[in-house]
């Protein structure tokens, strides 16, 4: 048995390739069921987002596992393997375990430490449980991965510092004003940066946001999404007189707000300070605005310094999580090692119970006049003898499973107790159970 992770992500594949191998939510369950029916695949979970598509699988052999996962991707999406194979990354066993932990913790994300991926991993895990495409191994592995990720975010500051310019602008405003709920925020520009700024503002408690854009319809569209107010570009002068915070990201070729405009707005502001953040390149806000006593101006270079500092803080937290990862990998491998001993212990118990049952039958034949009470006493004591005899071998078998040469040690253990056949029967039952679960897999879809 082996664990593999096969997939591609924003680092290894351009968006033109990623979009061709992206599962939508509606087909994910069907895809996992289909993959379960393939040769070599014992368990599987698919994690598919805008930045990655990854298949995690428990396989009976590494080479056949890799082959059938690639074949599945090619047939499901109707793409030749040669088209996407150069972009694939394949992790095996320890590498696959570590990769999953890193993904769940946000260490492999475009924005290090982001938490959205944890929700996506958890959703795929719950779906796989519901569709019965996983068993003992992945139930434990993914449960451990989700728990580790939650612990990592709780015990470190991996997600505490802003690492996008628009978010840093809002964080800077919060540091200066504290509570944003009573502040009037003016957003210049309804593009991507403006949208992110509005989203982060509302997430930080801002309640009064006005959007100004050269195309009024775009300003309305953005404002309506967040119950804000839109104003035409012609009303910018009036909007400046009302605002406490200005975040600008129009990307215009000339300054959108000049020192002269702000000087005129100051006549009605009654000395109220205005916090200005320019996240546009080229700059929207005239640098001379900083000469005004009531204006506090920051540009994208100021914010980049904050972001860079925060990235360094996140990296420190990531280094702490890497140490956590090592301990979790050891713990999971230790648990995984005990799986090999389960059929051995079951077979040993079954053989002991069979001997006890045969002994009771022999007693019944030789002592047919025993009372029911006497028979119960004998049955109880013979079972007690069996349990006492197994008290030492079973813990030792578990210890053997965790050793470096576990397979050879367990083989010797089975020979000593003469239970090779019983163990083989136990494993056969497990395989039959897996076959019954996956036999109703659905047909391929493209």
UniProtKB/Swiss-Prot annotation:
Substrate binds at residues 49-52, 109, 114-116, 120. This is Glutamyl-tRNA reductase. InterPro entries: 4pyrrol_synth_GluRdtase, 4pyrrol_synth_GluRdtase_dimer, 4pyrrol_synth_GluRdtase_N, GluRdtase_CS, GluRdtase_dimer_dom_sf, GluRdtase_N_sf, NAD(P)-bd_dom_sf, Shikm_DH/Glu-tRNA_Rdtase. The active site is at 50 (nucleophile). Belongs to the glutamyl-tRNA reductase family. Its EC number is 1.2.1.70. The keyword Protein biosynthesis does not apply. It comes from Priestia megaterium (Bacillus megaterium). It is an enzyme of class 1 (oxidoreductase).
């Amino acid at each position: 048995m082996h664990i593999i992770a096969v997939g591609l992500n924003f680092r290894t594949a351009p968006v033109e390739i990623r979009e061709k191998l992206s599962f939508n939510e509606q087909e994910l369950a069907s895809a996992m069921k289909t993959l379960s029916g393939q040769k070599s695949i014992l368990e599987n979970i698919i994690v598919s987002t805008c930045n990655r598509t990854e298949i995690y699988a428990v396989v009976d052999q590494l080479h056949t596992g890799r082959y059938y996962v690639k074949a599945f991707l090619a047939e499901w999406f109707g793409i030749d393997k040669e088209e996407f194979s150069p972009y694939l990354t394949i992790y095996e066993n320890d590498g696959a375990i570590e990769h999953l932990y890193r993904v769940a913790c946000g260490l492999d994300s475009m924005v290090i430490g982001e938490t959205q991926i944890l929700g996506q991993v958890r959703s795929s895990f719950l779906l796989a449980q519901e569709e019965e495409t996983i068993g003992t191994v992945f139930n434990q592995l993914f449960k451990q991965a989700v728990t580790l990720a939650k612990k990592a975010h709780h015990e470190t500051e991996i997600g505490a510092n802003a690492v996008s310019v628009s978010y840093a602008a809002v964080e800077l405003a919060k540091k200066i004003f504290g509570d944003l709920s009573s502040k009037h925020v003016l957003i210049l520009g309804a593009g991507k940066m403006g949208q992110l700024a509005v989203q982060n503002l509302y997430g930080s408690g801002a309640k009064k946001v006005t959007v100004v854009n050269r195309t009024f319809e775009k300003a309305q569209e953005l404002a309506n999404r967040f119950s804000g107010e839109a104003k035409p570009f012609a009303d910018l002068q009036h909007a400046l007189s009302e605002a406490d915070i200005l975040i600008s990201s129009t990307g215009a070729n000339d300054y959108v707000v000049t020192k002269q405009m702000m000087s005129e707005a100051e006549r009605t502001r009654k000395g109220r300070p205005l916090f200005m953040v320019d996240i546009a390149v080229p700059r929207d806000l005239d640098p001379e605005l900083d000469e005004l006593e009531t204006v506090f101006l920051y540009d994208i270079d100021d914010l980049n310094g904050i972001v860079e500092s925060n990235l360094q803080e996140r990296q420190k937290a990531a280094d702490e999580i890497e140490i956590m990862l090592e301990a979790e990998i050891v713990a999971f491998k230790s648990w995984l090692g005990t799986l090999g001993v389960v059929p051995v212990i079951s077979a040993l118990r079954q053989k002991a119970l069979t001997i006890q049952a045969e002994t009771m039958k022999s007693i019944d034949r030789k002592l047919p006049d025993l009372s029911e009470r006497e028979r119960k006493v004998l049955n109880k004591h013979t079972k007690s003898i069996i349990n006492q005899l197994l008290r030492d071998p079973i813990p030792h078998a578990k210890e053997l499973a965790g050793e470096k040469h576990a397979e050879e040690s367990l083989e010797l253990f089975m020979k000593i107790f003469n239970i090779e056949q019983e163990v083989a029967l136990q494993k056969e039952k497990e395989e039959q159970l897996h076959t019954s679960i996956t036999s109703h897999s659905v047909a391929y879809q493209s």
